[in-house]
């Protein structure tokens, strides 16, 4: 699949990640609800948002941490982040597998919409475990291969254990960044192997549908989403699963 650590996919002028999120208010708010649900009542010394692009999720973290850092490999996304985030949030260029922090020095790590670029996330999960404080938390979002619609499609065949490339055949080139969905059991085993254990999970973007977004008021979608996230987590229903991880078993 080529060099999956490259940042040039998001450095290219044709890739407008900020623009990508226009019209995706439901998806953003669903992820905001998940972050708030997992972190409400907690306060941290230093939060790091890994692979956070222009800072969409990073911007949610100052109310939970004294110091917030966006660690992003793309120089272009960091330039956009400087305008989007403004002052008060540190921005550094770093790969998820090579974070410039001392072992055990970070008490909150978030990594959202990064796993779908990582066919094998072992190195990145191990790096999160390395920098995470022994009593800290990590929030990792997983693109869920076993979501309800896919389980119906694969009825009788089961869900593959390994990652599945969701790119169209014409876009499957070695010079393109991977886009994969993961088997959640495999990911939780990979996390456990590096010392990260699941404390809680949420099913996110459960109502992601162009039709629903057109006909159902936004506030109603969010009300249902808020109630559905914990309720549907056991079913692994949604296309996105948020995991709250800790180094304590």
What are these regions (language model features)?
Residues 153-160, 184-189, 200-249:
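A C-terminal cap/extension of S-adenosyl-L-methionine-dependent methyltransferases
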Residues 1-53, 56-60, 77-80, 84, 138-165, ...:
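Conserved class I S-adenosyl-L-methionine
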Residues 110:
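A conserved beta-strand element that flanks and buttresses the S-adenosyl-L-methionine
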Residues 122-137:
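A short glycine-rich, Lys/Arg-flanked "PGG" loop and its adjoining helix->strand segment in the class I
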Residues 52-98:
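Class I SAM-dependent methyltransferase SAM/SAH-binding core
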Residues 170-186:
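Acceptor-substrate binding/catalytic loop of class I
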